[in-house]
Regions:
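Active-site-adjacent "gating/activation" loops or surface patches in catalytic cores
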Residues: 1-43
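Walker A/P-loop NTP-binding active-site region of P-loop NTPases
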Residues: 32-84
């Protein structure tokens, strides 16, 4: 990389000292070149075979993504994009368990038995899914409601296996009483009957096959709850693909304009930054 006056210097975000991790925050006033710096980092990382995923608001990375032959994904009216946050959460083939055992990773796995079938889930994946649904319900920082949502996820897995959707989680909750029923009703906008259901109900149709993928969220940025949920859903999809894929492949997830998600996703972002290093 180059310093402002053209001096060459070396910086490796994958170099870890002692008990540290690989997380990086970039701060600075508006217009000083934060996105330009990240673009430079992206091109450098790609030259070292690092896969790049960038969540952006404002099309700062559209040109560089297309120039590098990446996948530019725009969320908005008519985009036809679907990201079921529960897609890939449940594994019934044992692939997830085998991948983690082969890797020697410390990622915790839970086995759920439903009749004669066994399903495997990453507890980190369940935690992320719970946080996403918590954001949808506006139930953040309420341990009781979060526990009810987590229990509903497990009950839905027992009933539906790997065929999970937000609508099915909502039905499980609505079959309960009191707070559970209220949570299920609050999920309506994100179900197949709601205005945001188009983003979450169908199977995920994004492949993540390119070396660099940019998710442009400017068109949904005014709806803070939807923006927060979409950012979390994209992050969990990336996490599950990395978890079940080639564990030797390095990747970098960039959340530009992350401050916009802090009011609704601070817990999710904090927990992901702590666990993704595993």
């Amino acid at each position: 990389m180059q310093a402002p006056q053209g001096q060459l210097f070396n910086w490796n975000p994958f170099y870890k000292i002692a008990g540290g991790n690989y997380n990086v925050q970039i701060y600075g006033p508006s217009g000083v070149g934060k996105s330009v710096l990240i673009q430079e980092m992206a091109t450098t990382m790609l030259s070292h075979n690092v896969r790049m995923f960038i969540l952006d608001i404002g099309k700062s990375y559209e040109n560089i993504c297309k120039l590098l032959g990446g996948e530019f994904i725009r969320f908005g009216s008519g985009s036809g994009i679907s990201l079921n946050p529960l897609s890939g959460l449940v594994d019934e083939s044992g692939k997830l368990k085998e991948a983690i055992l082969e890797d020697g990773s410390s990622v915790p796995i839970k086995t759920i038995r439903a009749g004669e079938k066994e399903y495997y889930v990453s507890l980190d994946g369940v935690m992320y899914a719970k946080n996403i649904i918590t954001s949808m319900c506006g139930a953040g920082n309420n341990p009781h409601k979060e526990a009810l949502i987590e229990d509903a996820i497990y009950r839905a897995i027992e009933q539906c296996g790997s065929d999970l959707t937000i609508s099915k989680i909502a039905e499980v909750l609505k079959n309960g009483n009191g707070i559970e029923k209220e949570l299920g009703e609050t999920l309506l906008p994100f179900t197949d009957r709601g205005m945001h259901g188009k983003y979450f109900e169908n199977a995920a149709n994004i492949t993540f096959k390119e070396r660099i993928t940019v998710f442009e969220l400017e068109e949904v940025a005014k709806d803070e709850t939807l923006l927060s949920v979409l950012m979390q859903v994209v992050a969990i999809q990336i996490f599950m693909q990395v978890l079940c894929g080639d564990r030797s492949q390095k990747f970098m997830l960039v959340v530009d304009e992350a401050w916009r998600a802090l009011d609704h996703s601070e817990k999710f972002l904090a927990e992901m930054s702590r666990t993704i290093r595993k």
